[in-house]
Amino acid sequence: MKDILKLSLFCSLIILSISADASEWKKRSIYQLMTDRFATSIENPPTCDVFKNNYCGGDHKGLEQKLDYIQGMGFDAIWISPIVKNAEGSYHSYHTTDFYALNEHFGTEEDIQSLIKACHDRDIYVMLDVVANHVALVGNDFSGINPFNSPEHYHEPCAITDWANYVMVENCRLADLPDLKHENNWVSDELLRWIKYMVEKYHLDGLRVDTVPEVPKWFWTKFNRVCGIFQIGEVFNGDERYVHSYHGPLTSTFNYPLYFHIGDAFRDRDLTILNDYYSRQKPVFDDGGYSPLLGVFIGNHDNARFLYEGQRTKEQLDMASVFSIFWEGIPVIYYGDEQYFSGGPDPGCREALWDYGYKTDSPLYIYYKKGLYYRKKLELWDKDIEQLTFAKEYYAFRRGNDVLTVISLAENNVQVTINNEGKGKIKDGKYCNIFKHDDCFDSAETITVSMEKAPKVYIPSDKIDNDY
């Protein structure tokens, strides 16, 4: 019996070490969801009014029941909301009151354990959102916060008024949320004990780290070492060097510089803006090999949906989404995009998915299904990337020497001509579009692609799977 227990523990440690490895995470694609808004186990739930800023009934049990929906799109990792106890009304779960108790609105201990086991049984990684910067809005009465229940655990109240002042950013309150005093050894040690406890108790595979610049880098370095699994941090900033400075303290970050470039390109209807990222910002992230680990996204819970701006169309969302899947990095897709949600700034972008239905025949659901299937089949994460040609109305790039992606903003058909010579050429052979298998070409010194209002990804014809 002892030998069996030892073997079981050894296997568990192997699984944990594999999931903690950045080289494994770069192979994954992440579906971000807000637990309170994705799925509910309540029968006949009421319509969710997002502007009431309260719980709508989403829970871990409901999420587990909808794993088929997520896996059907090809996602093999989920990012879920923080699970710790929060101030009442904090449906987003970013306002902690007890670091060692669960948010009862999301379910029981058994529910979260069951969800994680169900995910692991399907080879879906679980990424938990965690907050180590602040606690709930309690003013200066910390008696109800566990374990940080004393004024000495916090910085003196002040507001962040200058985001270029790192001392202010690290020591003052974000939105009046009490700011934990990491230089207090007991506070930092307790936070490190807590994250180690969470990782081990729930067998987590990765962490999404909230409010990264608001916490000193020296703490994140310790956090990284103690938690022992992949972390991806929120550095809400468009400056590539500023974002890159958090690589090392944490495993990775979300690619906010690219997010802003994508938004600008589609807002201004000018895809040459993407060249600025490729030629000026991407080389910064290439230093140290971080580009393949960056989270590539076009929306999240903090920003208005892609379709909120009236100039943008569903076809453009299809283009941007396919771009994010085939670009260099880890695709991170925000729940509801597959149903073309168009909510405005927070809280408008936090719709309840059950109010709209879990349709698996929407065009973007199918784009995800096909795109993520081929991303994995072709092992895209090991392929280099090169920008091939661009203009205001189109953009083309390759991955390796056998994957060509083209997007277009043209109102009518446009011919995209690609010079296929030199070191980075597409290798010889017949290529077909993964989204329309009879759309093919034979590689030559010049490749011409006719673009309609749909993204195109060409791969060798012998790699096409008729089931996808």
Which residues are covered by each model-predicted region?
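Short, polar loop/linker segments at the starts of domains and inter-domain junctions
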Residues: S41-H60, G310-K314, D438-E452
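Hydrophobic h-region of N-terminal signal peptides that target proteins for export
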Residues: C11-S19
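Short acidic/histidine-rich active-site segments
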Residues: Y334-Q339
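Active-site-proximal helices and loops of the catalytic beta/alpha 8
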Residues: I116, H120, R193-Y290, L294-F297, ...
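Substrate-binding/active-site clefts of carbohydrate-active enzymes
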Residues: D21-S29, M34-Y202, K217-V243, D264-A265
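Sec-dependent signal peptide recognition
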Residues: K2-F10
